[in-house]
Amino acid sequence: MKFFISFAFLCLVLSCVAALSPDQVESRLKSYVEKRSFTLLRSARVSRAGTNTVQCYDKYVPLIRQAAADGKLACDKCAQEGQNAREEETKKSEVIRESLNIKVSSIENGLGSCVAKYDVLEYFTCLRDHASESQTTAAEVGKTAAVIVEGLNIVLTNIDLREKYCTDQAFEQAQEKTDALFSELENCLIEGLPEPEPEPEPEPEPEPEPEPEPEPEPEPEPEPEPEPEPEPEPEPEPEPEPEPEPEPEPEPEPEPEPEPEPEPEPEPEPEPEPEPEPEPEPEPEPEPEPEPEPEPEPEPEPEPEPEPEPEPEPEPEPEPEPEPEPEPEPEPEPEPEPEPEPEPEPEPEPEPEPEPEPEPEPEPESKPNSLFNF
């Protein structure tokens, strides 16, 4: 019973909020346009207008028809969207419907088997046995159907409301467009067509500039070869002693020359003999004192002259230092060492000069015997 009540309520709601069908929309638009057209033709102002009205009809009648057709298309679109939404929702309930069909079929099969029995006892016994099972299954089916009906009612109602709103909006837009066009048509019939403004001459299109030739793509530069990794510098070796420079190319080895005989070492120079010490000069012999002459007054003896100092011995010249031997150059054959120059012989010391002999004292002059001696 509950199922039937829900179904009746759904039908009532749908009848109240059902959207207009495409045919209904088309008929409503036609009636609206016809009504406006008759109103326009019956207008006193339009009837007093001039005869130049054909151009106005030629201009605005196609526009009015196009506006009505656009409104019909918009309404058809709304109806199609609503139908698609309803089909989508019904597809969702198909799975539940199939499961309920299986349960309903089991009830029908059980009760149908009872109807086919001819024996009265068997007939009532079958109904008694299947009644309890049928009631349980029917209760489950009823509950499931009630839930689905409530859900579908809400969903389908919302779909119908959206469709009606979309259709009404499309119809109102079509009415607004047709009203505006009828108003313009009325003004055109009363005042005539406005003089068309001279269309501005289209400016000559500028000649397209020749497209610049595409520059040839630069050839891809060859990728620079990776620089070789610098070899690790060898550790500095200790400087070897200077050796003869190696020849750039190995020449054939010459036959071994006989090794030069070692030069005899120079004999050591004889040391110079020590100079003999000068002999001491002999002291001069004392001169004999002259005999004193009888004089009244003896003259004092002259003092002996001082002996001349002996000249200092000249210092021996220093021996010249022997020149250092030149280092042998790195050559295949060493040069012989130069012989040291012989040291110069020391000059002999000059012999001491003999001391001058003392001059003899002058003899005393003899006094004249007379006082007058010329």
UniProtKB/Swiss-Prot annotation:
Region (86 X 2 AA tandem repeats of P-E) residue spans: 194-365
Any one GO CC term of the record: extracellular region
Key word Secreted present: yes
Keywords carried by this UniProt record: Repeat, Secreted, Signal
Chief subcellular location: secreted
Keyword Repeat: yes
Protein name (Swiss-Prot/TrEMBL): Protein TsetseEP
Species the sequence originates in: Glossina palpalis palpalis
